[in-house]
Amino acid sequence: ELNKKANSLSHLLIESGIKPNDIICIMTNRSFETIICMIAILKAGAAFFNVDPTYPIERTKYYIENSKTKYVLTQSELKDKVQYIENCIEIDLDNNWIYEYDNTNPNIKTQPNDLSYLIYTSGSTGLPKGVMLTQIGLANMVKAMLPVLEYLKEGNKHTIASVTSTPFD
């Protein structure tokens, strides 16, 4: 189900003109849709960044404008937090029609130095700065995390991901 929904959303993004290295913002409450978005964006060859919906609107606006985001993927109850953004198309994740697209794996080729995701620093020395991470960097991080993920399978150690904010990598 996860893969089919991610594939369908990725085809929607591709048909909407998303290309490798485009940046798409994800603003969701912690949910299954957050994971669908991350995977779909990567499958479309684009890069994602998560914005915590509890952030103040000015901070969110700064992130979205600074990153030159083309799309914001969000949920119905959060649309008021992104309605002020010019040149930004919202895709409401609560509408099931977005999962009616082709659910096969898209045929997109990415390069090792293409963007995969973006995070922002805390801004402790001024304005937060965007840090762009590449496909090869993501692959290396996942490879390095495999032993940790194996360890976390034991008992209730697997809950670590549920206590971090989604913008945290």
Locations of regions flagged by a protein language model:
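Carrier-protein-dependent adenylate-forming modules in NRPS/ANL systems
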Residues: 1-139, 149-153
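Glycine-rich phosphate-binding loops of NTPases
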Residues: 157
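Short loop->beta-strand "edge-of-pocket" segments that line small-molecule binding or catalytic clefts
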Residues: 160
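Catalytic "switch" loops of ABC-type ATPases
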Residues: 163
